[in-house]
Amino acid sequence: IRTAFLLDREGRTPTEAERDILRRYCGFGGLKCILNPAKELTDAVRWAKSDLELFAPTAELHRLIRENSRNEMEYKRYVDSLKGSVLTAFYTPKEITDTLAGVLAGHGIMPVRLLEPSAGMGAFVDSMLRYAPQADVMAFEKDLLTGRMLRHLHPDRKVRVEGFEKIEKPFNGHFDLALSNIPFGDIAVFDAEYE
């Protein structure tokens, strides 16, 4: 997260070492404790005993986001985005995405226009681009922090930091391959197209 904010401030693309750092990000899926108050040391008394070891890193996370937000409203947008992702931000391992991309390529499926509707850190995009490097990619990632990092990893691709439900009608039928491991669960998403 720190690296992504640094790249934004400096207005540049990441070095290979910075790309390696960005790729290690794995989201906050299952870590509800990041939503607990962590501004002051006294906030720790309200934390569950099992989460206390994460108090200091959580305080650092919020400090980092606050320092890199233009204002309190932007900080709140980041926190709200984190709230929206703690139940769904579980990213597919590279071994699985590589295997799926290899099987598709083995069957002659080489996309010209690739859609990733829930990209996370872009594992499916990375795996498929090894077989179809010229593919035109559109990747959606709803979480603001993850989307920021994904944009740095794929500066030459179309990365949209918003929900897939925002895709415009002209893209219906546009893609020849959609590849994803969308979040599963009973969380409803509003989509006016299917109202």
Locate predicted features.
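Class I S-adenosyl-L-methionine-dependent methyltransferase catalytic core
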Residues: 1-195
